[in-house]
Amino acid sequence: MLPRLFLTILPVCSPSISNKTSKKFRDAHANHVFLFEMDLNNTLSFFGKQLKLDTEEEISKVIDQIRKHLNLEVLDFRGNTLSVLAGKLIAESLKTRRELKECIWSDMFTGRLKDEIPLVLDALGEALTASGCRLTTLDLSDNAFGAGLSTSLYNFLQSPALYSLENLILNNNGLGLAGKTVGKALCSLIDASKKAGTPLKLKKFVCGRNRLEVESTIALSDAFIKLGTLEEIRLPQNGIRDDGIIALAEAFRMNKKLRIIDINDNFCCPEGAIQISEVLSDLQFIEVLDLGDCVCDDPGVLAIIAELDKINRDCLKKVVLSGNNITSDVIDEIGACFNSPKMCHVKVDISVNMFGKDFDSAKARHGKGNIDFGRRGDDELLSSDEEEEQGAEDASMEEDAFNTSRETVIDRSNLHEASADEMMNDLMNKGFGCMKIEDNQQNSNGNGMVSFLDKSLKLDTAESAEPVVKVIAAASSMKALELRGNTLGIAAGNVIAKALESHPELERCLWSDLFTGRLKNEIPPILEALGKAMMTAGCKIKELDLSDNAFGPIGADALKDLLESPSSFSLEVLKLNNNGLGIGGKQIAKSLTECLRKSIAVGGENRLRLKTFIAGRNRLENPGAHALAATFKALETVEWFDVRQNGIHEEGIRALVAALKHNRNLRYLWLEDNTVLPKGAKALAKTLESWPKLEVLNLSDCLIRDAGCNYIIDHLNPQHHRHLKNVYLCGNELTPPVAKLLIQKWSKFDGLTPKPVLHIHTNSFGDEFSDVAGMAPENVNVGDEDDDLGSLDGDQEEYNSKSSDSEDADLDDDDEDDDEEAEIQIIDNGESQLKLAMDRIDRLDIDFESRFQEDTARVILQLSAPLKSCKMSEPALQRAIEVAENIVRRVESVKRNPIPATTQLVNNIVAQCAGTGVKAETDWGYGADPQVISRLFSELVARGHFKLELALLQRFFPSQ
């Protein structure tokens, strides 16, 4: 009688019955209605519940629901994380579920160790076999299997429960060479299913973003050929080349019922496209052909469209040819094909190609409803008329209703980033410590930002940090924590770290200028505590800014555990500007390399994809450069790289350039104020073609001279570097004849909109400055004549050659100062001596846009030697005062609390001057004359500076 009861209940539960009547019936027959609804609903979903199944209590709640479900055909575990215990207990509960048909088990192991996953996979595979179920759909996407899980994955794919499989989705598993295992497993499964009398008839296979490359693709193709039943093959973003494409083409031919082919973002090249075109006539049911970003070029595209005419055109719905270097030479053939009456129903994507100046006319002729040219600004030969959105999705990856399913959508969402112009302004005006990547939500605590920016908090004890801890604890969601402009002690750091443990959602740590006035040995324990807290919480950090914290090499050691932990696998922005790293740069590089290794081992989306690396003013020198080179060669993902003012010589520069060659998305490269020299510039110039997205190149103050500047301009190509915005060649001893030549060559960029700007101010134009400036168009910046360094005479050229070209030259400030002293002593002529002193003072003032703290003190201390050598000549003194005042104004613009930046400047100078009675922790070796420094301070005080430090100055530098 139970079935009759169900029939009686059905009309009562119908949506057409009023809510009041339905509720009354439910109240009267609650048990029967519950049973009936569970029977109709064949799906049990835990999707997005973010369950962390560790304890038996948590696991039992899930198991109870599995056991109570009367007709469990679909089990959806997406977005939860299973421990080994959970996997085994859930597997046990599935052994009786013979009716199970679909297992949606993607994103099921977040935060689990790689040796835990195979144990769960083994248990679940055994359970499916024991249950006797016959699955039609298996989705294991977004689980970081990697190559290390080959055995367990192979065994799982041998289960008789998969003989009936129709849909297999293995998207974003980090398979790599484990793709060969999947191919072999499928071949074995095909053979076993045939022997069992139920041959496998797989219809859909999805395996995107898995680094399959050639070997794994060939293995999978062998399985596809044996199958012959596939209707949908999706293998986007797998680095497939040459032989892999050829193998796939043959596999396509053997699967006559193919409807969807998606090999977006692989390397077909013209040869591969031609191979694919030759099999299209065998595929009469094809609906979607996605060859976006496959570098097919004109010949490959022409071959494809020629063969499309031979298929069943009524079936064809969409063709994606975006990002294939298609030129206007073939646009008429493409238009004629897809605008024809028999093909005008087909949606065609040809955006992000190379139509250039013909874009508008081509679109006018052929851009009818079915052909999508995309935005004009997306064309590879044009520049957008409006600011391009950072991280915009490639049009070729857009999904629509007929080719999208919940199993196959590939998420390409990116974090919002600030416009490049805003970041550039911060860089040039405030220095890196003031630079922030904006977030539209950052001012709202409800949207994830907790900020104590410039609150001038002096947090020494746990009690003093209590207000901060309370705010952190009260935040329901804290994705960003900004502590810049405060000072943190050990006790306060520990309690704040403890508060972080309750915020696993933390992504952005904006912690620059956090240790003002602290001792060096205080900083590492705080860094370690904060890092440990984030690791304990399971944070996935995307941005870490520790700039302007003078922690030195010991700070780099303190960051080791954090940078090598899973919490840093997600790191996209790392800013370590002005930290005094020195040899600690090698440790940072080593930690990033280890982080990359571990993340790759875990697999999938866990791979470290660092985009921004800023480590200017850290005295990295050549050893640090070589260490970083090894790291960034392996990373391949950096977009913003800055190591300005690090004393890196030509050899180190060449190593960095060779490494960055592998980072094809590089947009910003800052090597300013290192010793690149012409040879280094030549090596860099030859690498420029590797960076088609380059926007800013800064080689100011790099001593690359005429030859180096010429190399750079010659190798910048308007056809290739379409995104270029600024090139800085300032302060490189560029002479007028070569400057005029470069201005002429720069006109090759006149076709770009907007035109990129070439900066060549602060060079050696001398009396010909007006001539050079007169030649310069609006997109060439020669600066003001007052900034020009004047003509190079023979003696100066020789001096610069000796001090800069020698492969053994040591750029340490101490040695450089000694060399210059020696050079001054051999000059007898008073006028020459004054000229050289003035030149040295001018050089200290070159492009002083972002130096502060120790750097500012170093420059003022270095003013002592040239002033003393010319016996404080009035012209030299006035010029030195101008330089010093420029520095002080910069320092005054930097707001620091509780100790003002100007006070820090005075403290550093006092400690480095003999006779003050203050002993420096480290002697910088300038030997500054206290009388000269005293005179400078007197003049600066007279001009209204150092009001807060007046008593300090009177004590250590009494007026002369």
From Swiss-Prot:
Listed Acidic residues bias regions: 380-401, 783-798, 806-819
Function, as annotated: GTPase system comprising ran-1, ran-2 and ran-3 is essential in nucleocytoplasmic trafficking. Ran-2 is a GTPase activator for the nuclear RAS-related regulatory protein Ran, converting it to the putatively inactive GDP-bound state. Required for correct chromosome alignment and segregation on the metaphase plate.
SMART domains per record: LRR_RI
PANTHER family, alphabetized: RAN GTPASE-ACTIVATING PROTEIN 1
SUPFAM superfamilies according to UniProt: RNI-like (SSF52047)
UniProt name for this protein: Ran GTPase-activating protein 2
CDD domains per the UniProt record, alphabetical: LRR_RI
Region listing for Disordered, in residue ranges: 370-408, 777-819
GO terms (BP aspect): cell division; embryo development ending in birth or egg hatching; nuclear export
Keywords associated with the record: Cell cycle, Cell division, GTPase activation, Leucine-rich repeat, Mitosis, Nucleus, Repeat
Tagged with keyword Iron: no
Pfam families in UniProt: LRR_6 (PF13516)
Record has Cell cycle as a keyword: yes
Compartments it resides in: Nucleus
GO MF terms, alphabetically ordered: GTPase activator activity; small GTPase binding
Domain of life: Eukaryota
InterPro entries given in the database record: Leu-rich_rpt (IPR001611), LRR_dom_sf (IPR032675), RanGap (IPR027038)
Start-end of each LRR repeat: 69-92, 132-156, 162-185, 227-254, 313-340, 475-498, 538-561, 568-595, 663-685
Gene Ontology cellular component list: cytosol; nucleus; perinuclear region of cytoplasm
